[in-house]
């Protein structure tokens, strides 16, 4: 099981002090960090990390603002094949009834935790970089996101729908992680949000209370 954490410098304190120790405590061994030190933006940094994947295995991609469930590593090892989405956000328009094995167009769009075959990651990066998004986009949203340098999740979802529409992917319920940007100072992308982007299916609420206490004690 390989894990890649997508991070920005502002969140490295959480990644190093809390997230990686939590993963290692569950037995995770191969953990990498892709730190966007140059602040290229989430799309450019994500595609660069995708292009750099090697081999024919797969990698679990985590954002730097997630809390893994108490049996995260065990469940990931059981699901360590193909494309797997481990997070569903109640406010991102994901189909809440589409869990288990679904065709790629019904994959959850949320990108906080997703397993991607390394060959698919490389293919996605090449596809995104090769498209002329102002003229060839399959949707009106993508050219805007391209100009803003955002929307890594949306581009990957579009990649699956366009290039691998008949692939069967896994939407995991209960979710494998909870999104806790609100606990870490808010979204580094938007800097505002009128709702909490929380997991729809999350069973380990006590872990959030414990983490909140540890972060408070750190200050």
Question: Where are the model-predicted features located?
Answer:
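Peripheral/terminal regions associated with large enzymatic or DNA-binding modules
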Residues: 1-62, 66-219
């Amino acid at each position: 099981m390989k894990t890649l954490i997508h991070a920005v410098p502002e969140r490295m304190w959480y990644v190093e002090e809390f997230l990686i120790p939590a993963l290692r405590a569950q037995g995770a061994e191969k953990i990498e960090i892709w730190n966007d030190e140059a602040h290229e933006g989430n799309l450019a940094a994500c595609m660069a990390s995708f292009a750099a994947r090697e081999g024919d295995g797969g990698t679990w991609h985590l954002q730097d603002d997630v809390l893994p469930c108490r049996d995260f590593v065990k469940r990931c090892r059981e699901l360590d094949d193909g494309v797997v989405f481990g997070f569903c956000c109640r406010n991102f328009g994901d189909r809440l009834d589409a869990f288990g094995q679904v065709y790629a167009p019904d994959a959850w769009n949320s990108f906080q935790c997703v397993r991607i075959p390394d060959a698919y990651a490389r293919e996605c990066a090449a596809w995104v970089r090769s498209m002329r998004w102002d003229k060839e986009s399959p949707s009106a949203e993508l050219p805007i996101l391209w100009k803003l340098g955002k929307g890594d999740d949306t581009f990957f979802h579009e990649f699956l729908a366009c290039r691998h529409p008949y692939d069967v992917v896994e939407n995991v319920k209960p979710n494998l992680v909870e999104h806790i940007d609100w606990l870490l100072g808010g979204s580094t992308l938007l800097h505002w949000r009128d709702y909490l982007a929380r997991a729809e299916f999350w069973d380990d609420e006590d872990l959030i209370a414990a983490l909140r206490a540890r972060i408070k004690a750190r200050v």
